[in-house]
Amino acid sequence: MAVSGSFIVPNHSFLSQLKSPQPYYSSNKQLSLRVRGSLCSSDDGEGKFISKEKDEWKIKYSSEKPITPLLDTVNYPVHMKNLSTQDLEQLAAELRADVVHTVSKTGGHLSASLGVVELTVALHHVFNTPDDKIIWDVGHQTYPHKILTGRRSQMHTIRKTSGLAGFPKRDESVYDAFGAGHSSTSISAGLGMAVARDLLGKKNSVVSVIGDGAMTAGMAYEAMNNAGYLDANLIVVLNDNKQVSLPTATLDGPATPVGALSGALTKLQASTKFRKLREAAKTITKQIGGPAHEVAAKVDEYARGMISASGSTLFEELGLYYIGPVDGHNVGDLVTIFEKVKSMPAPGPVLIHIVTEKGKGYPPAEVAPDKMHGVVKFDPTTGKQFKSKSSTLSYTQYFAESLIKEAEEDDKIVAIHAAMGGGTGLNYFQKKFPDRCFDVGIAEQHAVTFAAGLAAEGLKPFCAIYSSFLQRGYDQVAHDVDLQKLPVRFALDRAGMVGADGPTHCGAFDITYMACLPNMVVMAPSDEAELMHMVATATAIDDRPSCFRFPRGNGIGAKLPANNKGTILEIGKGRILMEGSRVAILGYGSIVQQCVEAASILKKQDISVTVADARFCKPLDTDLIRRLANEHEILITAEEGSIGGFGSHVSHFLSLSGLLDGSLKLRAMVLPDRYIDHGSPQDQTETAGLSSRHISATVLSLLGKPKEALQFM
């Protein structure tokens, strides 16, 4: 081992500790890893990765694996318990370097993880996980947590098929106390665990870590209100990084959380009164002296009596004891605060407000935390991402371009998103029409009813929300929109399987939960040109609500309409793509492309296939379905959605019309009745049994050709 140009020969006992980390060891031994505050890869000092300069750790990023001698001794949180503050600071530096190196090779969520490195180290140092529970809101920030809880050797598999999940997952590790992926759930879950702990007579701590972006959702306040009423012992860590931890960039840069809370937190951090009182507290406690008073000084420094009323009143009125703001990158301060709060016998609910920087410690992420939020593989030295080139745009961009074209001709069109301007493509719309685009924060319930109010007054709202996120506002869709027949247009992005983000973001259920509503028009495009037509169609529907779903990923290269301006479709009418005789495959949405491929496969088996694009799930094209049923031996419906969706509606019509009373063989191909784990889109399609090969095999099996069918399974 070479450190800062000098060789260190560790004793045998220490060498064995490096190979087989022990739960408890002397922090003095770890100091032998430091020579002139540097960690190097060669004895001449070249290749230095991590160094300490003026009490601050500096990291030199490169494509080489960083030297992390202290992190190498920490497999689980128990290995951190005897570390000094100086050791913890070094551990944080090595952990940050390791996160950047790992994500540069795998892709994933980077900026959020870098922003909580010191917080993660402090939490696992103070609290006795997994007995003590740490609940991470959303979960984008949990890579450091995974590394410190026995999963470092598996980090190269993160978000890959059969690898680690990109979010906390209960069945992955006992250290993942609660699964996540959606926002603003941590306080509710933590409160439930705290109450369960008390009822069961246990004594463990419960910590909920939530970002300021997630605090824009009403659920967080519902939970805090209940926590104050129950007076349960719960620790809430508010990670204030002035960023919504989602791809929320505008074209001018990252977006900050919207609403009054963001302003209140900013005022609190900048409060002159707070700063003066904090300095006064430091002076007084220094005069008293002594270790006990040093601890008291840290807590009193951040106690609620020393903050401005503009920031703390809300939390205190809800019944939470407020501590903060605390520097979220100061490990020593974090440890002191956590230890003091943990030692309190019955503190009730406590909110610790920490201030962090998203992307901290990695320059490319610090200057562009939005662009480095979710990344593909990248060059650690420059931060340049290795994005694959495509001849087509994403479906999201086609949607945005089409909506802009419609809005240029219709000034009643407005757009709404829930803190997802970048993810939904509405950042482009906002650039063009800043007064007609509304970011409501991570508040899908409010987004839907806000859109309903706009529609009630004659505007034409497009509410763009990921399919899985609209689940959070479903009562509003049913009660506030559909029941009143208000013409809100729902653009459901990320419909179907979404690859590496896994089941929390999978848009499996929207066909089912939207098509069961009596007044809703439900559409799905088979390609990017059809998407543009459906944007135009939704614009024209002004007597009832409508929705259209589209997948993650890029278009297939379909010929686009002139000037990217769609044509209004006839409501409830599909189209025939290929004419055949024996078998009919009726696809709904993007899976139509697999249906066409299956027809080509079957043609080689001398099987004549008709392929139809349904376009609409509600209202159904009953004339088309009747024709397909009458003219073919077999009718297969295919969709990338759950049980109860398009296939169920087709089956219901066929049964009521008596078309199932004859010899027709009907099969509905849908997602299996389980959650599909993260992986590549291709792997997920195979796992779900919805590839062109699976469609072909289903046809062959129904035609009494099991041997031929097995060739495609």
Curated annotation (Swiss-Prot):
FT transit peptide: 1-36
Residues bound to thiamine diphosphate: 140, 181-183, 213-214, 241, 362, 444
Recorded GO MF terms: 1-deoxy-D-xylulose-5-phosphate synthase activity; metal ion binding
Keyword Nucleotide-binding applies: no
Pathway field: Metabolic intermediate biosynthesis; 1-deoxy-D-xylulose 5-phosphate biosynthesis; 1-deoxy-D-xylulose 5-phosphate from D-glyceraldehyde 3-phosphate and pyruvate: step 1/1
Swiss-Prot/TrEMBL keywords: Chloroplast, Isoprene biosynthesis, Magnesium, Metal-binding, Plastid, Thiamine biosynthesis, Thiamine pyrophosphate, Transferase, Transit peptide
EC number: 2.2.1.7
Primary enzyme class: transferase
One GO process term, biological-process aspect: terpenoid biosynthetic process
Positions with a binding annotation for Mg(2+): 212, 241
One Pfam family per UniProt: Transket_pyr
Source taxon at top rank: Eukaryota
Cofactor note: Binds 1 Mg(2+) ion per subunit.
Cofactor section: Mg(2+); thiamine diphosphate
Locations listed in the record: Plastid, Chloroplast
Keyword Chloroplast on entry: yes
HAMAP family: DXP_synth
PANTHER family: 1-D-DEOXYXYLULOSE 5-PHOSPHATE SYNTHASE-RELATED, 1-DEOXY-D-XYLULOSE-5-PHOSPHATE SYNTHASE 2, CHLOROPLASTIC-RELATED
Similarity-based family: Belongs to the transketolase family. DXPS subfamily.
Protein name: 1-deoxy-D-xylulose-5-phosphate synthase 2, chloroplastic
Organism (species): Cannabis sativa (Hemp)
